[in-house]
Amino acid sequence: MFVHHTDDQPTHRTLLVADGIARGLNVQGGRLELYGTAPQPVWTRLGDHAAAGAAALTLSATTNWRAGDTIAVGPSDFYGMAATERLELAADAAGTQLSSRNRLTAARWGRLQYATSAGMRLAPEPGFNPGTPTVLDERAPVANLSRRIVIQGSDDAAWRNSGFGAHVMVMGAASRVVIDGVELRRVGQAGVLGRYP
């Protein structure tokens, strides 16, 4: 049995790279348990507006996210025209503050809106009770996509041109597999039955 680390001796980051031939992590009648530590929290929302071109973001919650982590910032526009954007963190999170290596291409809403006697506002009206709901939350979601254990295929011509990536295959009724908190990159093999991530 292969044991990479235990709770007493954790590792910071593990990268499992599949070879260029089979590109598979195969379990035949055995046991595979992968428990990665997920970032905390896994997702939150913006805590303030973010303009197009912004590299600094304010979140609504404190995180333990690290430099190099990949985050996804969801759209917040009413018409659904903006796409989710992937950013790479330039530094460890500082409280609720993030700084990224790349910039947002579209603005994101990041403030709560409150029902008031004059309509929706960014601050509640003291003493005004419109019934429910009183708060509209359209803040953009922000998720951390990085995990400390990564299973990935090679970034070569076979992947780029043919979709030939890594896969995890579990065979036999006696096999036991638990995968939790693991990131998969360049996985799946296009056009091959049973070669899914």
Locations of regions flagged by a protein language model:
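Beta-strand/loop edge motif enriched in small/polar residues
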Residues: M1-P197
